[in-house]
Design a protein with these regions (language model features):
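Mid-chain, structured segments of secreted extracytoplasmic proteins
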Residues: 62-108
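Non-cytosolic coordination micro-motifs
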Residues: 20-57, 93-196
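Sec-dependent N-terminal signal peptides
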Residues: 4-19
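Residue-level signal for well-ordered alpha-helical segments
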Residues: 15, 24, 54-56, 63-68, ...
Length: 196
């Protein structure tokens, strides 16, 4: 009897530990590993590293050009500068009309809701446009309850923003699809807190 209990406990502990180490995925790639490891995987998916633009933006971000869900996008990969660990990936559909931005948002929102149907959704508005946050949970969360960040693989934000470089009508818009891995985001934020 002791062996059965010990075996069951060991199996449950192994499953629990495995669940705690899972990462959110972008295009089937876990948001984990060093920036160089992640870059090698994303390049295999057809993304092209844009060195010039990467050097022009802030430290801890690399920029790629590619295609995401049938759309040309700019891909921003965020990583911790000291340990080079990836924690966030954002695809941006740039410079499109308001009508097209609304259509792209609706299409991607529906696809994400279908893929993550058992997860917690939080709808809101950003810049008078709809926005959606999906908490990709380790297990199903009751829809009435607020999500607990520790119980999630991470979160995915999708929203529309007006392009700030165009000041005259007709305005140009961008659609953002922003993936945050919970485990590595926590590590990155804890390192920042330790510096204070």
């Amino acid at each position: 009897m002791k062996r059965i209990v010990l075996f069951t406990f060991t199996m449950l502990l192994g499953i629990f530990c495995y669940a705690q180490s899972e990462h959110l995925k972008f295009s089937g790639i876990p948001i984990d590993g060093t920036i160089n490891q992640f870059q090698a995987k994303i390049v295999q998916k057809g993304y092209v590293y844009n060195k010039l633009y990467s050097e022009a933006i802030s430290n801890g971000v690399r920029y790629f050009d590619g295609t995401f869900v049938g759309n040309k996008v700019g891909l921003y990969v965020y990583y911790d500068e000291q340990i080079k660990k990836v924690y966030r990936v954002k695809a941006v559909i740039n410079n499109i009309s308001e009508e097209l931005a609304d259509q792209k948002y609706q299409m991607i929102q529906q696809l994400l809701q279908r893929k993550y149907e058992d997860c917690y959704f939080q709808e809101d508005k950003k810049e008078n446009k709809p926005s959606l946050t999906i908490y990709a949970s380790r297990y199903e969360l009751p829809s009435e309850e607020e999500p607990i960040w520790k119980e999630c693989f991470g979160r995915i934000d999708i929203f529309i923003s007006q392009n700030e470089t165009i000041y005259n009508y007709p305005y140009i818009y961008n659609v953002h699809i922003d993936y945050w891995d919970q485990i590595n985001t926590d590590k990155h934020e804890n390192k920042l807190l330790d510096e204070l």
